[in-house]
Amino acid sequence: MPAFRPRASKKYDETFDVVIIGSGFAGMACAYKAAQAGLKILMLEKMSVVGGNSAICGGNVACPNNPVQKALGIKDSKELFIADCMKDGLGINYPDLLGTIADRCNDTIKMVVDLGCEFVPNHMLFEGGHSVPRSYEIKAGTGSGYIRPMHAALQKLPNVVIRTRAKFDDFIIGADGAVEGVTYRSGYRFNSKLESDDLENKTGRTKTVRALKGVMLAAGGFSRDIWFRQTQDPRVVPTTDSTNQPGATAGVLTKALGIGAAPVQLCWLQFLPYCNPREKGFGVSVNFTNHACMDLGMVVDRKTGKRFMDEHAGRKIKSDALFKVIGTDENYPIAVCDDAIVKAINPSFVKLPLEMGTVKKFNTLEELADYFKINKAAFLEEVKRFNGFVKTGEDKDFHRILKFNKGLDVSKPPFYGIECCPKIHHTMGGVKINPKAQVISDVTHKPIKGLYAGGEIVGGVHGASRLGTVAVIDALTFGMIAGEQFAAMAK
């Protein structure tokens, strides 16, 4: 259904100051900041629970130049953060948006802490592709560590209404071309069995809502939209697995493009290299493979028994290397670490994978090699070589940064191993915004009045590929900024 102009006599079912489409990081942050100004907020979530992908992601969050870094003696800068992101994004990122994140990230962290989010104290994660440790580790081990306290805080506010099973259908455009409201369906039920839920699902009752200050797009990406993602990249076949929740489709994005929102880099899709082929979707093993094996341990090709990449490189580099090894015969690489590494990470990262059986535990490296059918002799020599690199601090094979291993290698039994493979994780492209989170028109090249966006539905922040933990700060920060923009209208 195309966007339409309501007749002068048209009556809305309801009127709010702000309508937010989506209930993840960007949506929650926007709602909180706008509600603080006394604005009346309506948040629409099409699924039966709030949070979207934000609730199931890893949850750790990058923040350059933060107080913990300074206390730990870690030197960082806005310029270094932007350079790291641009390197992994192949130089097609929008520097002004990255600069905005760097300038406001400490405000964002303060906001979520004030809302009850808890981080591991006095600790910074050293994520792949980053030059220095700059990421806070969320205590909960997943994005639920934000969504639960933020949702609880919003539920206590009388001027915030959150509706689940509420499917956005379209924008209502005023006579001046501004977005002045939306149509949505109440009582909608998502149906994962349909080829395209956005096109085929007609459940629910249509309602119209006036948005006096504007509409915020916080609907996330389209990693589960089989048709749209393959349209952008024909190599991504329908059976390609994704880490995302089933509702991650392009419905809201395509409606925004339909009213003139400028598209940015829609064909760039990111794979997450930390996934397990035996699990559906995100699974429970990602944090273990990432923080135990790739941050501190090693990954080997089972046929050769040898390493084949810098395990601390950016996600695109690692995913490309993994796909090359996997080939056509499902030769899934094996990620390995030891007991000392396991004891150094968040206990929740290993508990569930062990219980689910995706991570295997062995008394000796020989047993690990036998179980995973790794070239044993070559593997044992490769472990010795890797341990030597850790000792000297120099990776002569792949130039991995080892100084933050702080002596942790693969030498203390028991040993742990897990298969790994990439899955579609993040759709890099989306609508164009400016640093004020205003959506830009591809017709006028100016902001579309009344339309804002933040999070994965936005393109350009990360370029061709994003660094881990930057999506969280991106969504929270631009959600916060959009909320501030709405709040300023209340004055």
Residue ranges and their predicted role:
Residues 18-43:
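N-terminal Rossmann-like FAD-binding beta1-loop-alpha1 element of flavoenzymes
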Residues 2-10, 40, 46-170, 178, ...:
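Conserved N-terminal/central alpha/beta ligand/cofactor-binding core
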Residues 189-279, 478-481, 485:
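Glycine-rich loop(s) and the adjacent beta-strand/alpha-helix scaffold that form part
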Residues 378-465:
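A glycine-rich dinucleotide-binding beta-alpha-beta segment and adjacent secondary-structure elements
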Residues 24-25, 48-49, 383:
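Residue-level detector of alpha-helix initiation sites
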Residues 1-18, 36, 459-461:
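Extreme N-terminal leader/targeting segments of oxidoreductases
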Residues 253-255, 262-374:
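An anion/pyrophosphate-binding glycine-rich loop and adjacent beta-alpha core
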Residues 12-13, 32-33, 208, 346, ...:
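C-terminal structured subdomain/cap of oxidoreductase catalytic cores
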